[in-house]
């Protein structure tokens, strides 16, 4: 009898599963019908057996060139992971012919595999390449794959001419390839504007589960995103529920104001349903082309409070090199060192040299320099004994806070902080300061009493990081007049509230931010040797202005 009951239960569960199985017939779509052979695009194959970013890997790359292509004009680009998925070449043949897609070259990249000397697989690189949330995969496409593609010739001798305009470039993938497509566009919106992800692996493999929160916090990027997933998509429950995380991603895109479309069905973790959706996904992603994909408007209250929607980042063309940090100066300007010269720059890009540095002298701020453990203000000695000094903040009344490891010989140095290892910022009300440490996601908050004593240091501010555990050191930090903290990080400028939580992230096409300065209404950032400026709604606080109160945000 027990066996009979068990058999009945199994039969019932199998029957219910069969009833839930995805069995909807797909309507006829002319884009899925193979065209005559003489109308098909050409497919060129090559093998990559060297890589700087993924050492030892070997992979096949397939390049689709449509019949309509002529090398006299740059073609659009579609990058796809895992080779030719979705019967994509047939769909491209049809959609390009019908005019529903522009002339597009397809680049289909298989994941890397490492072999031993006997051609046995030693390492499958797919998860590393596709599920990582850093910018390595995008850099690999840009610096290693596309140069080889552009070096090819078609069988009739045409060169491969691909547009570098992100508005002309799309990227797609399934499963881990789906998150790889999104990650490439997210990290490099200067490369891709259009994304199709199917059964995307936005789960806890290599950090993808953090994306929903990060999308909500980050200033919208010019991306158009089409998502497909099935209600029963669970490849491995150890890592999470695929469909649940796709729902969270769709919710985040909606909150952040993206052009995003989704198709949910009864499917599981399979390429079948992404293949059915592929023609419509391509139509939707390219709808209205060549009109540019634009940024949306986020519901993020912090972004709304600090950003002026009339202004975006502006690149400042400068011929001088930038050595080290940048510092706020009067009238919305900044200063920085360029060799032995101290240069001043305004928001219009007007550059002038204001002073020179002596041998061994280091710029520490507007008018501030350090030489032989001695601090100078406009050439006049202020304090001695600043050993291993990393940062100085000038307060009102000719007082200073220093980040160093020493007993300073000066009454003008009100506080010496040794907790940090990189940078320092004093809060607008002078009641605490923040310092940056290396190899951690936290910043140190230290209370300052009225006598200048440093008390109760604590790892208080928590930063986001998508670099997959490299723990890249953050750059310098600055406060606005409302007590919000701005931090230069590899992800962009992260803005934290009074309680140490990042609530906004400002990203740039150039990638990570090495240094920043908030001078009046203007936020300046350095990305390598590139400088950008943005006019803000928020106002930067310069400690030289004196202590200023601001409204508490409470403990919520």
Model-derived regions, located:
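Beta-propeller domains
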Residues: 331-355
């Amino acid at each position: 009898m027990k066996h009979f009951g068990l058999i009945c239960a199994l039969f019932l569960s199998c029957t219910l599963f069969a009833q839930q199985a995805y069995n909807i017939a797909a309507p006829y779509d002319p884009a899925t019908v193979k065209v005559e052979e003489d109308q098909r695009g050409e497919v060129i194959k090559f093998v990559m057996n060297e890589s700087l970013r993924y050492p030892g890997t070997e992979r096949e790359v397939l390049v689709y060139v449509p019949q309509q292509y002529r090398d006299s004009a740059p073609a659009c680009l579609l990058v796809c992971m895992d080779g030719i998925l979705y019967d994509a070449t047939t769909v491209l043949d049809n959609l390009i012919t019908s005019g529903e897609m522009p002339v597009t070259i397809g680049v289909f990249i298989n994941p890397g595999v490492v072999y031993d000397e006997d051609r046995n697989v030693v390492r499958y690189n797919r998860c590393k390449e596709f599920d990582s949330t850093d910018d390595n995969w995008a850099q690999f496409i840009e610096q290693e794959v596309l140069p080889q593609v552009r070096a090819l010739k078609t069988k009739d001798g045409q060169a491969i001419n691909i547009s570098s305009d992100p508005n002309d470039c799309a990227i797609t993938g399934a499963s881990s390839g789906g998150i790889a497509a999104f990650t490439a566009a997210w990290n490099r919106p200067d490369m891709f504007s259009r994304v199709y992800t199917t059964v995307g692996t936005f789960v806890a493999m290599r950090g993808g589960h953090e994306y929903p929160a990060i999308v909500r916090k980050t200033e919208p990027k010019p991306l158009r995103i089409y998502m497909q997933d099935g209600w029963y998509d669970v490849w491995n429950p150890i890592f999470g529920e695929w469909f649940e995380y796709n729902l969270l991603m769709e919710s985040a895109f909606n909150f952040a104001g993206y052009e995003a479309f989704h198709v949910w069905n009864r499917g599981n973790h399979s390429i079948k349903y992404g293949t059915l959706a592929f023609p419509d996904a391509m139509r939707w992603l390219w709808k209205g082309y060549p009109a540019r994909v634009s940024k949306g408007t986020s519901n993020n209250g912090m972004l709304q409070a600090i950003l002026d929607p009339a202004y975006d980042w502006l690149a400042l063309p400068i011929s001088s090199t930038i050595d080290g940090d940048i510092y706020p100066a009067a009238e919305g300007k900044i200063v920085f060192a360029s060799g032995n010269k101290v240069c001043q720059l305004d928001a219009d890009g007007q550059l002038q040299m204001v002073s020179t540095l002596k041998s061994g002298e280091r710029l520490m701020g507007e008018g501030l320099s350090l030489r032989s453990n001695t601090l100078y203000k406009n050439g006049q000695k202020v304090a001695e004994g600043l050993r291993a000094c990393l940062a100085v903040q000038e307060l009102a009344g000719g007082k200073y806070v220093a980040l160093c490891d020493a007993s300073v010989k000066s009454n003008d140095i009100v506080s010496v902080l040794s907790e940090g290892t990189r940078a320092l910022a004093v809060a607008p009300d002078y009641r605490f300061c923040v310092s940056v440490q290396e190899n951690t996601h936290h910043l140190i908050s230290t209370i300052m009493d009225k006598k200048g004593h440093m008390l109760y240091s604590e790892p208080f501010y928590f930063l986001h990081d998508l670099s997959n555990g490299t723990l890249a050191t953050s750059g310098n930090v600055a406060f606005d007049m409302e007590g919000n903290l701005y931090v230069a990080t590899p992800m962009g400028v992260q803005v934290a509230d009074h309680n140490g939580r990042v609530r906004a992230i400002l990203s740039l096409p150039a990638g990570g931010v090495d240094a920043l300065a908030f001078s009046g209404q203007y936020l300046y950032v350095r990305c390598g040797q590139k400088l950008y400026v943005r006019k803000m709604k928020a106002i930067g606080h310069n400690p030289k202005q004196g202590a200023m109160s601001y409204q508490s945000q409470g403990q919520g």
